[in-house]
Amino acid sequence: MYRCVIVDTIDIAADRCKKYICNQNGIEDLGDLGYGKGWTKFKEEFNEVFRGLTQLGYAVFFIGHEKLEVVDNPDGTKTTKIRPQLSNSTKTVIAGMADIYGYAHQKATGEMSVLTLRDGSGIIECGCRFKYMPVEIVMNYKNLVNALNDAIDKEAQENNNMYVTNERVVAPSEVTYNYDELMDEF
C-alpha cells in the first residue's frame, strides 16, 4: 500500500485549485470575490485536500520549481535569493502546512544531490519546524527520516522526553527482490 503522495509540481496544483475555486464561484480571478474571500476559499480547499491526506496517514511531498530573485540590500548591493516559484499567497499556504521546507540541489556537477533544510545566510528560502534538523543532508528518504528522528529525539531530551510529534517514523530498510519469485507471483 502507498504511504506517501508526491505532488509534482505544486505550482500546477495551486493553479488548478485556483481555477476550481473560480469555476465554483463564477469568477475569473480569486480577487473578484473581494476582501480576500477568494484566497480564503483557496486556502480552505488546499488545506482540506492535503491535510485530509495527512490525517489518513499519508506523507505529502510537494515538489516545485525554484525562482531566482534579485533583492536590493540596505548597503546598496544586490543579492540573488532562491525561493519557490509560487505566488506569495500560495507560498504562505504551503509553508503553513509544511513541517520541512527544503531546497534540493547539486553543489557541483557529478556530486550527489543535497537537501538544504536551514540557511542562515538568507539566500535560500527553506526551514523546518524541528529546531535540531541539520542544515543539509545528502538527499534520499532514509537520510531525511533519520535526520528527522534525531531532531525529534534531541528536542524530546530538552522537554523531559515529551515528543514534539505523536509517533516516530521508522527508517525504511533496503528491500531486495528476487525476480523469479516475483514472476511466479504473477
Task: Place the predicted regions along the sequence by residue.
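Charged/polar, solvent-exposed surface patches and flexible loops
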Residues: 15, 19, 41-44, 48, ...
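Interfaces that engage single-stranded nucleic acids at replication/repair/recombination sites
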Residues: 123-186
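Generic hydrophobic, helix-prone segments enriched in Leu/Val/Ile
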Residues: 17-18, 84, 90, 94, ...
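Walker B beta-strand of ABC/ABC-like P-loop ATPase nucleotide-binding domains
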Residues: 5-6
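Phosphate-binding/switch region of NTP-binding enzymes
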Residues: 60-136
